[in-house]
């Protein structure tokens, strides 16, 4: 049921990803102008990711009706399939952000969605079905939800679950999101809808990220007061300056509880680029650039934390083991599950972007 109040009025807040999770949602990829070769390689990768997460917690996958049978064949029998229409398969951004209160009750938020920029720089023209997905998911899992009065995607925000929110100016202040709102007004809306006390604004996201710099591709919150940050030591890499800007902001701030923020540098893979074969397998589109030789916005920070497990993208044989080692040292109590996920990267994101956790 759609509510007319706000989370702040009702005492609900945004919990951290590393807190207990009851289920994880994905959507089944099919767009031929985003996923190569009729989306078949992407479907294989999505299925592998969903099946591995299903060994840890309940998994639900939204699928359009014409792909139901194929998805059912590829997914484990304990993965629930639900027919929900959508325009593309980025559940982090089109699904609900689910809040909790002190009594353990849950409520969702249906953000307004405009395909990462609307008429200004959106990636496709028709996002009407995407904009309804969050409400549908809330109805299916049986929770009430708020309809937020502004545009936001789940990949644009990270939290420590203790009052601190991390985001980027590049995304939230983009003219394609909420040009009618000032930065101060956006802060106020985030506090009202997410129950947070402090917002840490990083200047930019990852280089060439077509979401206008989602924070979940740049960094991840792995514990209260502790983050991993995508990093390169190559001065010729455009990301070199961007990561240092982000680190300087993080070093200069304290979180909502007054803690200094511990930063773990997580090296970037690559740089990685579209191959000619990969680019040629994607249908032409006016909104999405998929050209041979174009740099991919690749990051190991785009992982998912679920109940003591980290589902980590594997992207480059030269750096995969380094990323695993750094994360395992930073998160010794977690089991890291490494999953080759280049096919998700080719579509413009990675494991965190295609999943949305529901708090327990």
Swiss-Prot record:
Enzyme type, top EC level: hydrolase
Known EC number: 3.5.3.12
Origin: domain of life: Bacteria
Xref: InterPro entries: Agmatine_deiminase (IPR017754), Peptidyl-Arg-deiminase_porph (IPR007466)
GO molecular function: agmatine deiminase activity; protein-arginine deiminase activity
Active-site residue numbers: 353
Entry keywords, A to Z: Hydrolase
Reactions listed under catalytic activity: agmatine + H2O = N-carbamoylputrescine + NH4(+)
Gene Ontology biological process: putrescine biosynthetic process
Entry keyword Hydrolase: yes
UniProt-listed Pfam families: PAD_porph
Homology family: Belongs to the agmatine deiminase family.
Protein's name in the database: Putative agmatine deiminase
Organism: Vibrio parahaemolyticus serotype O3:K6 (strain RIMD 2210633)
